[in-house]
Amino acid sequence: MSERHAVCNESDIPENGKYAAFVEDEEVLIVKSEGRLYAIRDCCSHQEFPLSHGSVKGKVIKCKAHGAEFDLETGRALCAPAHVPIDVFPLEVIDGVIYVELD
């Protein structure tokens, strides 16, 4: 069963910003881009480099290590060298607090 966990306040993340945190031993990255929030596992599926070091444009995050790109909504790998998707987590904002659901 999924559990909802508070990660941070929405105001902690500037537009086009990122917020990395450990939630129940899971490395979670919250991304705010174009007014939307996304929650992903903070780990590139190519060589496990932290995606929090990468760049964001629209709904795409690019790994700083080797240039792999992922769709923030679906986790789908968009280009080599990554072929495996990243984990995405459901999130919701309640009274300004961002919560993620982990399995």
Each model region followed by its residue ranges:
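Short acidic-hydrophobic sequence patches enriched in Asp/Glu that either
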Residues: 62, 83
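Short glycine/proline-centered loop/turn elements that form peptide/ligand docking sites
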Residues: 80
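N-terminal pre-ligand scaffold of iron-sulfur
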Residues: 1-58, 71-72, 76, 85-103
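Short cysteine clusters
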Residues: 44, 63-66
